[in-house]
């Protein structure tokens, strides 16, 4: 693994590159909320061993890019612009793929209205359509008008503890993985599981609503191949039901 700088419209982003000797394709990976690019090292080395050139970076407010304000993404538009600029840095002569996990899947679904990759792998994506989720979204948006930068433990617990309650067991953050070792490592990792700002929750919620609009889906390339994946117990994707809904669109 090597590192390179990609100069975006916002800043110079430190991008990790996994480069095989004879790459057959290129892939950009977009990670999820309250985690960082390093969690995907094993997966990207696996792809590298199978001759796929991979790049990954930390979203704004995450990992190496917390800028002293970890958990604050700024805006979802910034996340999508960064993803577009890093995507454009992929080798031009290779088929291009993008994989987005959880919050990264929302970034990807917005990004797909502006790019035409060979393939898109959408992992654990979600919607917010239940009456309770609509109430929670309205509540968060209201609080964001007054305290956008606050990292409310109550709201963070409302979001993530609610996910935990849908999964058997007692470990904190058990909703993130069926593999107990993954959960333990996540909880030990100082760059994972951190609170995010109310503004970040608002931005994510609004983006989830936006990705289902015809303005976005109507601009997807008909030549892009899709692979939709979800854990059957994943609470963010409503136990995989949101993947089925997306497949039907």
What are the functions of these language-model segments?
Residues 1-19:
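N-terminal cap/lid segment of alpha/beta-hydrolase-fold proteins
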């Amino acid at each position: 693994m090597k590192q390179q700088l990609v100069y975006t419209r916002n800043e110079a982003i430190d991008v990790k590159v996994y480069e095989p000797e004879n790459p057959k394709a290129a892939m950009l990976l977009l990670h999820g909320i309250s985690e960082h690019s390093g969690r995907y090292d094993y997966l990207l080395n696996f792809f590298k061993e199978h001759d796929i050139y991979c790049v990954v970076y930390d979203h704004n407010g995450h990992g190496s890019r917390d800028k002293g304000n970890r958990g604050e993404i700024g805006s979802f538009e910034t996340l999508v612009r960064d993803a577009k600029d890093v995507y454009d840095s992929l080798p031009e002569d290779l088929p291009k793929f993008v994989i987005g996990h959880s919050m990264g899947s929302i970034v990807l679904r917005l990004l797909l209205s502006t790019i035409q990759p060979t393939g898109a792998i959408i992992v654990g994506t979600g919607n917010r359509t239940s009456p309770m989720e609509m109430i929670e979204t309205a509540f968060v948006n209201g609080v964001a008008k007054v305290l956008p930068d606050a990292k409310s433990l109550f709201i963070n617990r409302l979001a993530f503890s609610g996910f935990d309650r849908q999964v058997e067991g007692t470990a904190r953050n058990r909703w993130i993985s069926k593999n107990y070792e993954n959960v333990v490592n996540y909880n030990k990792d100082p760059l994972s599981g951190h609170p995010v700002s109310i503004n970040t929750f608002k931005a994510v919620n609004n983006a989830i609503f936006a990705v289902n609009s015809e303005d976005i889906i109507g601009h997807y390339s008909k030549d892009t191949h899709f692979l939709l994946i979800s854990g059957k117990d994943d609470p963010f994707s409503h136990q995989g039901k949101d993947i089925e809904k997306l497949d039907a669109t």
